[in-house]
Amino acid sequence: MSRVGKQPVEIPSGVTVTVTPDNVVTVKGTKGQLEKAMHKDMKIAVEDNKVVVTRPSDSKNHKALHGLTRALINNMVIGVTEGFSKTLQLVGVGYKAQLKGKSLILNLGYSHPIEVASIEGVTFEIPDANTVVVKGINKELVGSVAADIRTFRKPEPYKGKGIKYSDEVIRRKEGKTGK
């Protein structure tokens, strides 16, 4: 069995998980509701406050789907109880972030400010001018929005300027040495 897939997903109190016959999993919790269609081959059952995922065969594809399905359901449960967040840091002279309504304005050394429109299910927080926190209940969406923001100015290896994740380490290069 898949080591990830064979572990059942614990359902905390205040969370309800429902599975339709066509494998659409709905998770409702204190922070909101998430819904995702899972692969039709996987059997998903809710048994005494646990979600159990079983696979039809031991083929390589089914083994991979088994662990994936269990991990996706686990992320949905964590999302509706705790939520997810990604922290981005703006490194560079004059680089700053600010909120305008619900959208995010970034000054990244370009001739124009960059505006990131608010996306449903994702909120932005700015603890200080050089830090942006992307929060939401959908792990995939939070990571995707954070990655999109990072692409506006990826960290460069010589001075380390750009937008980086808070836990990311930038590999630095040495510049050219003069004669």
Curated annotation (Swiss-Prot):
InterPro entries assigned: Ribosomal_uL6-like, Ribosomal_uL6-like_a/b-dom_sf, Ribosomal_uL6_a/b-dom, Ribosomal_uL6_bac-type, Ribosomal_uL6_CS
Species classification: Bacteria, Bacillati, Bacillota, Clostridia, Eubacteriales
GO cellular-component term (any): cytosolic large ribosomal subunit
Protein name per its UniProtKB record: Large ribosomal subunit protein uL6
Keywords: Ribonucleoprotein, Ribosomal protein, RNA-binding, rRNA-binding
Family per similarity comment: Belongs to the universal ribosomal protein uL6 family.
PROSITE patterns for this protein: RIBOSOMAL_L6_1
Subunit structure: Part of the 50S ribosomal subunit.
A Pfam family of this chain: Ribosomal_L6
GN (gene name): rplF
Function: This protein binds to the 23S rRNA, and is important in its secondary structure. It is located near the subunit interface in the base of the L7/L12 stalk, and near the tRNA binding site of the peptidyltransferase center.
GO molecular function: rRNA binding; structural constituent of ribosome
A GO biological-process term: cytoplasmic translation
